[in-house]
Amino acid sequence: MTTLASDHPVSLPDDLPGWLRRDLRSDHAGESGAVEIYRGILAVSGSQDVRAFAREHLRTESRHLRLMDALVPPEQRSRLTWLWRLAGWVTGALPALFGPRAVFRTIEAVETFVDGHYAEQLTALANA
């Protein structure tokens, strides 16, 4: 069992089905990329509003990543995590070059995708 900084124990059974392990691996990669989106924004944006938004969301996504780190053992994580991190950073930095509107539109698109992805996973869990 792993304990997070918030002292909430986290453990998963050893007999999780393969599809659920794959979903968790995907979610871990996604959270890794999400952290980098906000780091990319912070590296490029000069807008104080955008930077405040990015700092707040970076804290949230960092908590999510810590949870996923606790749930998914290193040997079960995607071998392409480095690529998802790079893609995340570029996904944040590139729109930040074009200003706040581009940043917020990009985040809206990413979050819309993520909401759909998690909805599919919840449906799969409900039907398992």
What do the PLM-derived regions correspond to, one by one?
Residues M1-A128:
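Non-heme di-metal
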